[in-house]
C-alpha cells in the first residue's frame, strides 16, 4: 500500500501487520501512475480530493472516519485573520459554523496536549450531533505494533476541556511511542 502519511501507515500496519507499506509522494495523478506501474497494489487517497478533481474513474473502498481516524482538523477549512482587524473579523466570524468550531476546538486541544505534528502518528476525530460532542483519539506506533485509543462524550460547550482530558489520557498510555519520535 502506498502512502506518505506516517499516521496512515501506522494505522494500516496496526490493522494489517502483513501489509508492506511503501512511500508514495506526489499529486493524485502521480500516485495513480505509480499504482498503474505496479509500485504498490493500493494507495490511500482523500475522497474529497478525487471529487474536487472530477476523478469519478477512480474506484475503491471508503474508509469510515470512525474506523480509520483522520488527522486532527482534517477537512476543516479555516480563514486566518489579524486579531486586531475589527472590520474583517466580524465578517469572517459570520461565515463560521459553530458545530465545526467545537469539533476543531476538541481535536486541537487533544493535539496540543500530545504535542503532535505531521511527523507523529496521532489521529483525532470529533462529531457534533445535537448538543453533544463525541471525540475519538489515537496514538499509534509507526510500525503499527501498538495503538492507544480513547474517546470522550459530553456537552459541546466543554469541547476544549474534553480534548485536553483525552490528550492527557493518551499521553499517559502512549508516552513511549511519542518519546521515541522526539
Where are these regions (language model features)?
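Small-molecule-sensing regulatory modules
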Residues: 18, 22-182
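Bilobed "Venus flytrap"/periplasmic-binding protein-like clamshell domains
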Residues: 1-18
